[in-house]
Amino acid sequence: VGKVIGRFDPTPSRTPEECERHYTQVHVRMAQDLLRPMPSLLSYYTDRAVAQADVNGGWKQRPRAWRFVVLRFTPGSTLAFTAEQNEMVAQDHVNCLYRLRSCDVEENVLLDRVDGQLALTKFMIEADRATGVDADGAWDVFRALADRVRGVMDGAFGARRLIVNRVLNEVECEPLDVEGQRPIGLLDDTTRVGYLEAYFDHRRWGEEALGVLAAGGALGDPALVGVNLLRIEERAPLDVTG
């Protein structure tokens, strides 16, 4: 399956409230209209960071992330907008977002106990590699972190699914009114390492199981920077997987 995970912040040229309003009421609807006719599209999910694990093992830290987008395609396919559609999307970024980091990823399902549930709570871990650390070395550390999470979830009440995503590349973006709004190609190199997506029946079970991973700064490693453990509000504007 082809998969893209994008990350972005609310543009500083608008208030956070206006960015949220425009993104949910305008941008997502536009994306639905553009993506729905694509025969290769499997799903389009929007993720909002609503909480972050803190050094006490609780969830009182203000999230260091705003929103993510997760797109899945049939094998061998990826996002395929026309030049005109790409420009329309980029121009709309001005109204709500910047610092876009869109990455093709390779996913590996480490745990899957989903069986008919219609509502789940999502958690995510993101990471970049530190200066001077090569991509393979950073990935080894991140994969070891994924194994730690798997170990926690194996015996955790309400744990349903764990996916580890290795970043393959990152889109290069140029500014319109501020940085990171118009995609123009691929970066020669990316510092983004990967994403972990963890699903539980309820936020309580996920917070109780995963919060301990951040206690005392235990998520830290010299090979990684920007390691954030987030609780996510996920929506599915499009899903044709059945």
Predicted regions and their residues:
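Macromolecular interaction modules
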Residues: 1-242
